[in-house]
């Protein structure tokens, strides 16, 4: 039976770091799949982009097509082994925020758990400014908070279409990373035990 745990958070929240560290400690065995990487691979195959950060600037129609292709690939993987899906609940595009999982996509993936990683907007802004490798939009702290609020709302919608449980984990600069990693480890261990 397919088994997916989705982990989301806006760029700069520390989602990938928390995921990497939690997977080193959990008893559960998950394959980490990055939704954006799969979309990027599909977009490169089609000749639409050459850099990952260009995907969010494609037309909404093309992005939705890429999302559905990615969902099908994730479903195939999750039928063989549990998947920890690293992704974004919403994506900021030039025209506004796009849902990371339109209804037809979330219904294909059908996750068991949705984990949201959050931090204070000032912490996220600082992390983004230190990460010069990525081509990220410049946002104010208010815009960052709005994006996190939209992620919560979107995640509730996803849970409605998949019956997934929702967990919010906070990742703060002052000892928050260790606590966040421990919380995710508990969720991953619990997720696998619930499925047994």
UniProtKB/Swiss-Prot annotation:
Alphabetized UniProt keyword annotations: ATP-binding, Cytoplasm, Kinase, Nucleotide-binding, Transferase
Subcellular location: Cytoplasm
Principal EC category: transferase
Pfam families: AAA_17
Cross-referenced InterPro entries: Adenylate_kinase_AdkA, P-loop_NTPase
Catalysis: reaction(s): AMP + ATP = 2 ADP
EC number: 2.7.4.3
Family: Belongs to the archaeal adenylate kinase family.
Name the UniProt record assigns to this protein: Adenylate kinase
Organism of provenance: Thermococcus sibiricus (strain DSM 12597 / MM 739)
